[in-house]
């Protein structure tokens, strides 16, 4: 950030720069950015290809000061990997008390009581010394489990106040559920980075359920692949994925599924205030021309038949050509065809069949189930910037002691007191004030709480 500041202060010879959202607001406050409203309004593609939410982010006093870069896809990155073969064995042995497997019909969900029942059975199947559910180091709030208790994001508006997750209604019930699992010996918690990781625990049958990111699927699924198998196309039918848990009252109801998703604007193209009008006009025109549909597609994913194929309207990479020629292409764009990019980017999640399996499962119907964190769209905020990191760390450390340590019972009041002592009320009030003045608050999350 200091280097960027210096580049602007010294009026170095550049016409535009890609900066982080936080740096954008710092430069905007310093008066270092050129307004580009008239050029955006006169563009052929640019204005219409970026959402109202995006333009709102970079607008101040009616002037546009940057071209926002949205994350390619509204999606969840994490899901629960589970031993599908063990669940099948349980159901065959218990025809009168079966557990519904995650499927398209139920939105790849499972209700909380069935999940616990599955863990109880898995505890009889793990290797000696293992536990049914493996939870990674530092993880206290499992985003696949929290929605079952009404906690849909790290920050959510409730009755006019934007609340941190531990302050939201439902968190106490979540914590009691998790402590119950731990106290009954169903959970392995990776206490330090030197302890066995949960992916390794799953691979060695020391755990039957773990949280996994979609980029970890290849490691999970290919460990038992037959010799000579094409690993890029291999998936293991013994492994399945859960997108989220639902309340028992919503068992089997795909419309009740809610997942933590994300799609913020993490970077912004900006122009220095010392640009001439001709320079600014030329830069925006250049960005606009790159959004011509055919040129944009070729810039992002290459040429059909050479770097990608299209199957049923979906884009799939041709390897290794896609990696060799287009590996970093999505990092070099300035301005997006947002809707098109959300389809093209999926080719990057399909580099292996295993990754495609995990990603597509946990993001099944995500446009109707995913809830995003509004704070991802917030401008600079003194209370949040100054206090939140410490408050978040202190609360998380306390949750580790309470959730994964039988010696200390969960105490919501104690968690709340830590939050307050770390200026949590100031953070909450400041975020709420911003949120209530945010022009896009009513359209940012199209999916609502259950």
Residue ranges, per PLM feature:
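Conserved small-residue motifs centered on glycine
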Residues: 285-406
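Histidine-centered catalytic/metal-binding microenvironments
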Residues: 398-450
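Extracytoplasmic/periplasmic substrate-binding proteins
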Residues: 140-157, 179-336
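Hinge/lid segment of periplasmic solute-binding proteins
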Residues: 22-79, 140-179, 227-262
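Second-shell loop/turn segments in exported
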Residues: 96-108, 161-165, 378-385, 399-404, ...
């Amino acid at each position: 950030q200091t280097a960027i500041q210096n580049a602007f202060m010294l009026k170095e010879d550049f016409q535009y720069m890609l900066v982080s959202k936080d740096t954008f607001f710092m430069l905007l406050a310093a008066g270092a950015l050129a307004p580009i409203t008239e050029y955006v309004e006169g563009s052929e593609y640019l204005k219409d290809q970026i959402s109202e939410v995006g333009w709102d982010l970079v607008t101040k006093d009616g002037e546009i000061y940057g071209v926002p870069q949205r994350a390619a896809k509204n999606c969840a990155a994490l899901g629960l990997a589970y031993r599908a073969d063990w669940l099948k064995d349980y159901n065959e042995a218990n025809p009168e008390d079966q557990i519904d497997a995650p499927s398209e019909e139920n939105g790849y969900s499972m209700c909380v009581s069935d999940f616990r029942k599955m863990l109880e059975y898995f505890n009889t199947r793990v290797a000696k010394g293992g536990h049914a559910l493996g939870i990674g180091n530092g993880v206290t709030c499992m985003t696949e489990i929290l929605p079952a208790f009404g906690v849909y994001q790290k920050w959510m508006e409730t009755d006019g106040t934007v609340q941190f997750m531990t302050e939201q209604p439902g968190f106490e019930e979540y914590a009691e559920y998790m402590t119950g699992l731990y106290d009954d010996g169903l959970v392995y918690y990776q206490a330090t980075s030197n302890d066995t990781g949960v992916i390794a625990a799953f691979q060695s049958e020391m755990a039957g359920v773990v949280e996994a990111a979609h980029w970890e699927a290849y490691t999970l699924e290919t460990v038992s692949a037959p010799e000579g198998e094409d690993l890029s196309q291999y998936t293991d039918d013994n492994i399945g994925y859960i997108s989220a848990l639902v309340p028992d009252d919503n068992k089997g109801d795909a419309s009740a599924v809610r997942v933590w998703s994300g799609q913020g604007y993490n970077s912004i193209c900006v122009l220095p205030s010392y640009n001439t009008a001709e320079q600014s006009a030329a830069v925006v025109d250049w960005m606009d021309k790159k959004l011509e549909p055919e040129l944009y597609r070729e810039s992002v994913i290459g040429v059909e038949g050479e770097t990608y194929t299209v199957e049923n309207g979906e884009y799939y990479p041709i390897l290794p050509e896609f990696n060799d020629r287009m590996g970093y292409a999505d990092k070099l764009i300035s301005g997006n065809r947002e809707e098109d990019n959300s389809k093209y980017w999926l080719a990057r999640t399909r580099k292996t069949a295993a990754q495609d399996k995990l990603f597509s499962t946990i993001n099944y119907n995500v446009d109707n189930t995913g809830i995003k964190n509004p704070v991802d769209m917030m401008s600079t905020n003194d209370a949040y910037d100054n206090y939140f990191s410490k408050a978040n760390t202190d609360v998380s450390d306390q949750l580790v002691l309470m959730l994964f340590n039988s010696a200390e019972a969960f105490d919501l009041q104690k968690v709340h007191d830590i939050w307050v002592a770390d200026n949590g009320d100031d953070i909450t009030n400041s975020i709420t004030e911003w949120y209530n003045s945010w022009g896009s608050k009513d359209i940012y999350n199209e999916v609502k709480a259950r």
